[in-house]
């Protein structure tokens, strides 16, 4: 009977933890949907295979929501095997988040190189109509930038020979005309001077530490849930033996 107060305390803590865990799943799900709707154009320029990133967040968030509810149910039910299954799932989530966080931090320079390569390729194949061209236009308009390093990068693009610099580079598109955009000297007074690569990579460098810290913080929080679930399972089993 001595284990009952401990079980009550552990149940309360684990229910609170499972609810917070469930909330993180909802947040991941929301971020995934938001990323798909809002950041799809940026993601498509980081790497061709990275367009699945929002779907990964949506899938991960949905899974966490389901297991967060399962954790609450297992805790209220007081089932040792359910609690062990919950702890096992938390350990898998911990390992997956840890690997993802380390990989993202270690390979951040490769991500920057990939962005440089894919953005340069997108400029060379730019036609103003396809998805990657629209992505380039969206980046240049939203970040008020032009080209990779600066606006002169467009002079090597086949599109420039026929149409000049894309209007998305203009500081004021109503003040730009095709003749101005064909002439690099005149265009210098009409288009944004900053390159898109520097703006994107400086944002990554500035926020990488914060992102990594949050990722590791969330990952290690799974250890708390694992510990609570395992302890509660053990105390419930011990209490059953005491009753016998």
UniProtKB/Swiss-Prot annotation:
It is a multi-pass membrane protein. Gene3D superfamilies: Tetraspanin. InterPro entries: Tetraspanin/Peripherin (IPR018499), Tetraspanin_animals (IPR000301), Tetraspanin_CS (IPR018503), Tetraspanin_EC2_sf (IPR008952), TSN6/7_LEL (IPR048232). It comes from the Eukaryota. Pfam families: Tetraspanin. Keywords: Glycoprotein, Membrane, Transmembrane, Transmembrane helix. Residues 1-11, 71-81, 230-244 are cytoplasmic. The chain crosses the membrane at residues 12-35, 52-70, 82-107, 209-229. PROSITE patterns: TM4_1. GO terms for cellular component: plasma membrane. Belongs to the tetraspanin (TM4SF) family. May be involved in cell proliferation and cell motility. This is Tetraspanin-7. The lineage of its organism: Eukaryota, Metazoa, Chordata, Craniata, Vertebrata. The gene is TSPAN7.
């Amino acid at each position: 009977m001595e284990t009952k107060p401990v079980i009550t305390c552990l149940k309360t803590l684990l229910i609170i933890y499972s609810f917070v865990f469930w909330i993180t799943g909802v947040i991941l799900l929301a971020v995934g949907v938001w990323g798909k709707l809002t950041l799809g154009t940026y993601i498509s320029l980081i790497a061709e295979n990275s367009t699945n990133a929002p779907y990964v967040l949506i899938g991960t968030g949905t899974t966490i929501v389901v297991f967060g509810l399962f954790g609450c149910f297992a805790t209220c039910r007081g089932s040792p095997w359910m609690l062990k299954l919950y702890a096992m799932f938390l350990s898998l989530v911990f390992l997956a988040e840890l690997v993802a966080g380390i990989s993202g931090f270690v390979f951040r320079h490769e991500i920057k190189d990939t962005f440089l390569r894919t953005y340069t390729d997108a400029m060379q194949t730019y036609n103003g109509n396809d998805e990657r061209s629209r992505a380039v236009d969206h980046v240049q308009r939203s970040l008020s930038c032009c080209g990779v390093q600066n606006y002169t990068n467009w002079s090597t693009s086949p599109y420039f020979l026929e149409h000049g610099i894309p209007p998305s580079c203009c500081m004021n598109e109503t003040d730009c005309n095709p003749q101005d955009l064909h002439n690099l000297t005149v265009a210098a007074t009409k288009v944004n001077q900053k390159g898109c690569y520097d703006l994107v990579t400086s944002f990554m460098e500035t926020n990488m530490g914060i992102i990594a810290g949050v990722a590791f913080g969330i990952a290690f929080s799974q250890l708390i849930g694992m510990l609570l679930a395992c302890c509660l399972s053990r105390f419930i089993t011990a209490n059953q033996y005491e009753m016998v």
